[in-house]
């Protein structure tokens, strides 16, 4: 475990959580039970998605990103659907690269929209974000407010974290 962390890799311990590299302390541990956040993106936006993954993890969330979580030999369509279904939030990263592109990104969005049908209407599940000045698909834009991560990345991330935390607080209050 230590060697992997020193090499800059995260190490997931089933049933417990994830050890992650940390520049200040060497590593940090994220226990299971943290709110799960699925990140959907196109491969051209992988660097931005990885930055968002890091920001969410640093804020105490457990992000899910295919490049970080899929295992060799794993059935990736099934793993992705399971991850979306188990997530507390689904962040769709739209950009000029994703506009009109066919493939896995679109399938993930469609599956998330199906999952959202099972969630109470006033709960937030899908959080669309724009990585650049692109068009958000009409079906999404007509129903769900998006957040811009440009030109001020930090401000956009703070807005995402704020809305997710308010939702989690509301869900906890509703259970008690």
Model region roles, listed by residue range:
Residues 133-144:
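Glycine-rich, charge-decorated loop segments at or immediately adjacent to ligand/cofactor-binding or catalytic sites
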Residues 1-35:
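Strongly charged
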Residues 34-93, 97, 113, 117-125, ...:
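Conserved N-terminal substructure of TIR/SEFIR domains
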Residues 143-160:
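Output/docking surface of receiver
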Residues 129:
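Extended, charge-enriched "interface" segments that sit outside catalytic cores
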Residues 100-107:
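Glycine/threonine-rich flexible loop motifs
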Residues 99-100, 119, 147-151:
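Short, polar/flexible loop-turn hinges at active-site or ligand-entry regions and domain interfaces
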